[in-house]
């Protein structure tokens, strides 16, 4: 009898702990998106990067969809996300981001063909998913989000004019973005700098890192499939 009571008490305590933990998670997800979004983004990015098998790829697709929905729902929800530029873009810039991504991929493809450079073959599905969703989100939140804000704030405090500060920030971040891609040299490095400038221009014009991430995602997705043409 005493053993049964002990088991019941243990069960009640476990349920209470689980309920408290679930409440903490719910509170973090809803009230602290500036904490949950980066953690969830890194988690999805890591899962997708190794999702070679079909079952793992299916899980990666599901998590990616959840990430995109959550990322959209928390646009501009907290002051920290506002600093990162994770907000809805100016009117019309969702569409402009897609068009700019298409134009950028076509431009890079044309440059590569002109110089008889290969863009490689079509990557495996998990790499395409990574390059067209969590990858661009992660890179844009870091480069056109956090670093863009830091460099721009530094130049602004040095009393640099807004136009000059924005222009310099775009170029500096683009160069850093290009050199962060290990192994890129020559034409590949220069085109990465150019696309980084294009992503930065979209960030500045739309006033949204999310718009730059969408442009980046479209660029990667299209380039993945036209690389062999």
Predicted regions and their residues:
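Juxtamembrane helix-loop-helix connectors linking adjacent transmembrane helices
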Residues: 51-54, 75-142, 149-160
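Alpha-helical transmembrane spans of integral membrane proteins, capturing the lipid-embedded, hydrophobic core
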Residues: 32-35, 39, 43, 61, ...
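N-terminal, membrane-interfacial amphipathic/helix-forming hydrophobic leader that caps
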Residues: 1-92, 103-109, 224-229
